[in-house]
A protein has these predicted regions:
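Donor nucleotide-activated moiety binding/catalytic core segment of transferases
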Residues: 31, 56, 61-106
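Catalytic binding pocket for nucleotide-activated donors in carbohydrate/polymer assembly enzymes
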Residues: 68-74, 103-174, 178
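CheY-like receiver
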Residues: 47, 90-93, 154, 189
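Conserved catalytic-core segment of nucleotide-activated headgroup transferases in glycan assembly
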Residues: 1-70, 145, 182-184
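C-terminal amphipathic helix plus adjacent low-complexity
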Residues: 15-27, 53, 146-199
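Surface-exposed, flexible loop/turn segments at secondary-structure boundaries
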Residues: 2-4, 63, 85, 123, ...
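A generic local structural motif
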Residues: 41-43, 83-85, 103, 130-131
Length: 199
């Protein structure tokens, strides 16, 4: 989990993958249509202009083969290919995350940054990504949207790109220890396991 924090005036959109799909099927898929709707949204562009923000769209590594199919109408929207980006840098340098079910939302929440879930598929991809153990309605770290227009509305509702009280509590419940000693704790846990195995 990312422990550093260095935020730019940038939105990050990162969505999970659709397994085993062809390009011809992908362009017909709800996933493509929903992402396209958001990327081409005049309301989103207006929001970015008003807030002087940039928007980085970073498809899942398995979806990067389709990155050429996406386009934007504004120089404030960047379609990011994996070859010229490091995921950790995108997480650190973004102040808001828009995602469907991608587990990067845990990293974002750990840094106490706002998350907006754009779950346009009525939970279908949730099953495919094995997130059945996580209840987004009950445990999620941000609002759930079904349409691109709803995402933009939620962006406007954010206050100074901070989590509201409801989601702060959920983050604290999920991550009761928040410091810079995670690596040390993992190391000590591994050492204890090794010691137990040698007994």
């Amino acid at each position: 989990i990312v422990e550093e924090e260095s935020t730019l005036n940038q939105l990050l959109a990162d969505f999970s993958a659709i397994p085993n799909t062809s390009e011809s099927d992908f362009v017909k898929d709800e996933y493509f249509q929903a992402c396209k709707e958001l990327l081409e949204s005049d309301e989103l562009i207006e929001f970015l202009e008003k807030k002087d923000m940039n928007f980085v769209f970073y498809p899942h590594i398995e979806m990067q083969k389709f990155v050429h199919l996406f386009a934007s109408k504004s120089n404030r929207i960047v379609i990011q290919d994996a070859g010229s980006a490091i995921v950790e840098d995108l997480l650190l340098n973004s102040s808001i995350l828009i995602t469907d079910y991608s587990s990067v939302f845990f990293d974002f929440a750990y840094m106490f940054k706002p998350v907006i879930y754009y779950q346009f598929d009525n939970g279908e991809n949730e099953q495919a990504t094995n997130k059945r153990w996580f209840n987004f309605e009950k445990d999620g770290f941000g609002p759930i949207c079904k349409h691109g227009t709803d995402v933009v509305k939620k962006l406007y509702e954010l206050k100074d790109v901070h989590l509201n009280t409801q989601y702060q509590k959920r983050v604290n419940d999920m991550f009761p220890v928040r410091d810079k000693n995670n690596s040390e704790r993992v190391y000590q846990a591994i050492m204890r396991l090794e010691k137990d195995e040698t007994r």
